[in-house]
């Protein structure tokens, strides 16, 4: 973990879910520093590299890039050094769908184009970090097997009082702080299916050397609002916001500004590989939004 003060929060969250923590060891490490990593890797046979910087608050490009790129490089080298059997990277669908073309349906062969106008720093960093990993595998041919999992928008109930970016946004929706729905389209997957996909990938020979998108279904933001409205969250937006309004408000609101390059653009996916190799999906995106809303309200 990156902050030892969160140990109790992690323990409590797991215990509430009925999980035993008897065999759980938490070691504080920093993606940008060497200390502590060799200790953390002692006796480790499988690595799930899930850590990434993501925030709705303004941060510099460097604050996104360095942890992603240096962190990925560090994990690769440590996995090699400590004879790890398997490394699973949590990448993202954002490393897939950014394009300068009119393409709307994507698969694992697609890569985000870093020259896409308006591409977010987070999207760039995830794309570059994943490419770094695949390049390392090709160049060094390490003994460990490598798999990249690329989830779409991850949504679902929170396990603690700490709200991540997704759940904080859901809270704003149910509180009526988002009065209208921007014409924004994205794929989603339930957080529990993302966790299950990682577990199902461990020691699974079918996923070695594979890039797998986790994408249960796609929704327009207005559809998300309608789902929550019908579930009793009457402050959720059901009317669509005109693109010109989003652009105008985006001059002052940085979270809306990030949506501008994607207004009106569909981003769909053929997620057959996840179904065939990992047994996805057990929950719908609709369930994910409803459970998230109930957990934060």
What are the roles of these predicted feature ranges?
Residues 49, 58-122:
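Conserved Rossmann-fold NAD(P)-dependent oxidoreductase catalytic core, especially the SDR/UDP-sugar
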Residues 118-121, 156-162, 179-192:
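Glycine-rich "substrate-gating" loop/helix at the edge of Rossmann-like oxidoreductase active sites
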Residues 197-257, 276, 285-297:
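Mid/C-terminal beta-alpha module of Rossmann-like enzyme folds, strongest
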């Amino acid at each position: 973990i990156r902050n030892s003060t969160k140990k109790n929060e992690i323990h409590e969250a797991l215990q509430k879910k009925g999980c035993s923590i008897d065999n759980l060891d938490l070691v504080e490490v920093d993606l940008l520093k060497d200390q502590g990593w060799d200790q953390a890797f002692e006796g480790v046979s499988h690595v799930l590299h899930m850590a990434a910087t993501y925030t709705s608050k303004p941060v510099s490009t460097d604050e996104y890039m360095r942890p992603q790129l240096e962190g990925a490089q560090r994990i690769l080298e440590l996995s090699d050094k400590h004879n790890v059997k398997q490394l699973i990277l949590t990448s993202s669908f954002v490393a897939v769908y950014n394009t300068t073309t009119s393409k709307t349906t994507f698969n694992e062969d697609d890569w985000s184009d870093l020259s896409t106008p308006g591409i977010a720093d987070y999207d760039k960093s995830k794309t570059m970090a994943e490419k770094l990993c695949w390049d390392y595998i090709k160049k060094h041919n390490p003994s460990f097997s490598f798999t990249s999992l690329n989830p779409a928008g991850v949504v679902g109930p929170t396990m603690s009082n700490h709200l991540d970016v997704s759940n904080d946004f859901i809270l704003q929706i149910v509180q009526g702080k988002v009065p209208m729905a921007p014409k924004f389209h994205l794929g989603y997957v339930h957080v529990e299916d993302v966790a299950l996909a990682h577990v199902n990938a461990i020691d699974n020979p079918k996923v070695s050397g594979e890039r797998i998108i986790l994408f249960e279904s796609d929704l327009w933001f207005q559809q998300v609002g309608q789902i929550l409205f019908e579930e009793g969250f009457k402050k959720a937006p059901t009317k669509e916001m005109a693109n010109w309004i989003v652009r105008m408000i985006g001059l002052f609101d940085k979270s809306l500004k990030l949506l501008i390059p994607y207004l009106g653009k569909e981003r769909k996916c053929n997620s057959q590989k996840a179904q065939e190799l990992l047994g996805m999906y057990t929950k719908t995106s609709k369930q994910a939004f409803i459970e998230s809303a109930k957990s934060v309200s």
